[in-house]
Amino acid sequence: MNVLERLDAAQPWTQEETMLLDSVRQLAAEKIAPRAAHYDKTAEFPWDNVKDINNLGLNAMFIPEAYGGAPLSYACYLACVREISEACASTGIIWATNFHAIKPLMDFGNEEQKQRLLPRMAEGGLAALVITEPTAGSDATGMKTTFTPDGDSIIMNGSKIFISNGDVSDLYIVFGKWSEIAGDKESISAVVLEKGTPGFSITGTEDKMGTRASGTASLAFDQVRIPRANLLCEPGDGLKILLASLNKSRPSVAAHALGIARAAFNDAIAYMNDRRQSGKRLLEFQGLQFNVADLAAELVMVESWLWRVAQLIESNAPNVGIEASILKLKATDLAMRIATDAVQFLGGYGYCKDYRVERLMRDAKITQIWEGTNQIHRQLIGRSFLKKEKR
């Protein structure tokens, strides 16, 4: 048992969680991983992977029992994200995005909203978190989508881009600005939009470098009328909802990245144990041992921090934003480094599509960009040490 396997074995899973993780690993190895190259090539949505995940009831793990769920720990959720992402990064994003979108509804929705909307998610529905716009990426306060109250309804107008699951979802958590509130931050609000609502359209999907089977869509809202009952909290509460949600979704992005990192690391180790040069296996050369040692050490440290942040979130620690940013930053940078090094370790083979490290290198890049670019996370972390000047 190597150090990564010992780290996994040390996690205090319950018997139920252990059984579920075993089932997820089996599904990932036997069905999801063998399909990954096909979906990367065709960029088709992996409906069979989603069906298999739903057959295990995985959506139910982050939904309370009162709404049809079977909740397990946040750490177990992160472990499932990592296992699925190691097999297929696209499928990992699809499933993790469900959590990203459903979590605001669970944390901030009222009882009527939860009773009405969560059971269909527990049964396997798809959801999307809708934030980014052409003029509002890292600075979400620049969004232009508007919510205008009209009696018992809200009229939504605007557009969104780069929305994961945007072309396939049943529910959308949409952020925009309340027309009757001034201020870029103060006006941000959040609503639930259901598939098929008149005036809502999908205007296109992106042809991406990596995670090609995960749909990334552009959305348009033209006089979309939704019930006032679909407003989360009160008008102007959107920024609070958004920031709280990101603190829980960023560790999920880190787990996704660590799945990619694990896949690339394992492929590189297998190749270097098998490939011979000058009468030796590659991993018998000291220089490559040093390379592997550095990657393994960083992987162990980042995964240890993953479980630490999960523990903080499960204990309802009041301030985990910087911890989540550190995790997202280090996990995603490491995924890109390990995937790039794996291509180098495999030489010419690593550059060919017959070996999945080529795909993993492309898949890893998005992890440094979405859920806050790593430049933004560095700014957040650095700024947290800035002391207020005394006046």
Enumerate the predicted regions with their spans:
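A short, Trp-centered hydrophobic/proline-enriched beta-strand micro-motif
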Residues: 123-132, 175
